[in-house]
């Protein structure tokens, strides 16, 4: 396939995905609607919806690049969990993903799967603005817009929803053909309901946002800035406004609702600033000089938190491009100036580790782990350093203890797979890898890893039985084939 053809295929696939997500977030209902802004619907995720969610994410992984950085994924998940605390129902089923894309977008997919694009994080100016978008998506989930849309489609015998989902699942040119075959009157019919669902998600999103301690005004600040930037650009609306249409009526409704909430100044969030610069440093386009330039003009900022974050971004960029000596120097300066900040201690340890100073990194992280026993991220970095130092048994113990406290953290299992593999325990390595795949909604790959693990087991009846049982459990989750 030529470069041009690949580019067109990607653009077509993304168009399919964007249109489908717009439909997911807006359509009619055959269920009884909850009162506007009510939390009574709550989070309800049936086994069928969970299965669809797994299929959806597995298919999305073929079209999009998912971020696997433990610090960034923990930040997005923690923000989502903070916002969902005021909701009722099965909030444990909520899953948050971070996608590496410059598009300003976020979506709520089936099975309470929610995705945030890195372009959205870097486009927002405060954590409250980012939280306002996630709160809006939680509003879609709490009001069960996707299940209501699908039920209405079934009752009206409209194949659009299933075909649009198939367009995502098939992907590429085949998916585009499936989308095109059903994107006529049925799509227009369902989009007529988008406005009502956006209204519900706006109203409920404001409640979710303010219940989590954020100012409601952040919602309109972000929407108006996006709208203004759209008018000044010739490239069209950001993806978020294409999937969440912004009309004057919608702006007026949000503004009228905001007046019901007390306004206050949001204290700046260092975690948010760190997340933004981490995205720019680790995933920004261009060479070292180009990426470093993103932070240079912030170093003399009168906003202390902005200057701090810029220094952090510099260190991350230097590590990314292999300038470890300079990274260690700047990270040490940051740690000296702000000794209480865990992020700076982690980035110093990372610079030491990448430069080959493994024992220094282990010593540094061991001290930090003792001071922050509840931190999953610190435990992850400590276990990783122990593995690279060849201390596999200690690394395994750290991971086992951390997994007991955070059993749904996929990256712990991925690291455990590496530790077991380095230690020569191949069946256990593939067993841990299967858990990682499962938590990433890649059930087929999880089954494959377990099947491979079963071929490596010898003289261990308990382990073999455990693997066989898990294979059966996962096979039961697979969609039945016609």
Enumerate the language-model features and the residues they cover.
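Active-site recognition of the HExxH zinc-binding catalytic motif
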Residues: 116, 132-140, 144, 201
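Hydrophobic or amphipathic, alpha-helical segments that drive membrane association/targeting
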Residues: 2-8, 13-107, 229-234, 292-295, ...
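Extracytoplasmic and endomembrane cell-envelope/extracellular-matrix remodeling and assembly machinery
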Residues: 31-32, 36-43, 54, 66, ...
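Short pre-active-site segment immediately N-terminal to the catalytic Zn-binding motif
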Residues: 115-132, 193-196
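Membrane-active amphipathic alpha-helices enriched in small hydrophobic residues
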Residues: 158-173, 177-188
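Catalytic Zn2+-binding segment of zinc metalloproteases
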Residues: 128, 138-155
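Acidic/histidine metal-binding catalytic segments
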Residues: 72, 92-95, 150-158, 176-178, ...
């Amino acid at each position: 396939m030529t470069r041009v053809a690949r580019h067109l295929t990607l653009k077509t696939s993304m168009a399919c995905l964007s249109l489908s997500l717009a439909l997911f977030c807006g359509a009619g209902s055959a269920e009884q609607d909850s009162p506007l802004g009510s939390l009574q619907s709550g989070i309800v995720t049936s086994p069928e919806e969970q299965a669809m969610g797994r299929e959806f994410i597995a298919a999305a992984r073929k079209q999009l690049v998912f971020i696997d950085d433990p610090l960034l994924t923990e930040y997005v998940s923690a923000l989502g969990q903070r916002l969902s605390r005021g909701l009722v129902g099965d909030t444990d089923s909520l899953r948050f993903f971070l996608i590496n894309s410059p598009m300003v977008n976020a979506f709520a997919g089936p099975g309470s799967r929610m995705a945030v694009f890195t372009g959205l994080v870097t486009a927002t100016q405060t954590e409250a603005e980012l939280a306002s978008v996630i709160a809006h998506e939680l509003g879609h989930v709490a009001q069960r817009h996707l299940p209501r849309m699908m039920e209405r489609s079934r009752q009206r015998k409209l194949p659009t929803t299933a075909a649009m989902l198939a367009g995502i699942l098939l992907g590429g040119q085949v998916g585009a053909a499936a989308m095109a075959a059903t994107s006529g009157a049925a799509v227009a019919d369902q989009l007529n309901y988008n406005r009502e669902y956006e209204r519900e998600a706006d109203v409920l999103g404001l409640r979710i946002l303010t219940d989590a301690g954020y100012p409601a005004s952040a919602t309109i600040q972000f929407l108006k800035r996006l709208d203004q930037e759209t008018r000044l650009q010739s490239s069209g609306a950001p993806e978020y406004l294409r999937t969440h249409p912004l009309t004057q009526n919608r702006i007026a409704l949000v503004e009228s609702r905001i007046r019901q909430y007390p306004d206050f100044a949001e204290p700046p969030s260092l975690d948010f600033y760190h997340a933004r610069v981490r995205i720019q440093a680790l995933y920004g386009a261009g060479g070292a000089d180009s990426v470093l330039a993103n932070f240079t003009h912030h170093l003399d900022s009168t906003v202390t938190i902005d200057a701090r974050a810029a220094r952090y971004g510099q260190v991350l960029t230097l590590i990314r491009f292999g300038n470890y000596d300079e990274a260690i120097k700047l990270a040490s300066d940051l740690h000296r100036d702000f000794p209480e900040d865990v992020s700076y201690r982690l980035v110093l340890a990372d610079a030491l580790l990448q430069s080959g100073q493994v024992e220094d990194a282990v010593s540094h992280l061991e001290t930090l782990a003792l001071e922050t026993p509840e931190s999953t991220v610190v435990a992850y970095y400590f276990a990783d350093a122990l593995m690279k130092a060849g201390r596999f048994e200690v690394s395994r113990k750290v991971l086992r203890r951390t997994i007991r406290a955070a059993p749904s953290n996929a990256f712990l299992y991925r690291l455990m797979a590496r530790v077991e593999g380095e230690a020569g325990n191949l069946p256990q390595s593939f067993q841990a890898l299967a858990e990682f795949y499962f938590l990433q909604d890649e059930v087929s790959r999880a089954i494959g890893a377990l099947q491979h693990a079963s071929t490596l087991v010898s003289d261990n009846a308990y382990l073999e039985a455990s693997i066989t049982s898990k294979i059966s459990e996962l096979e039961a989750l697979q969609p039945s084939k016609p």
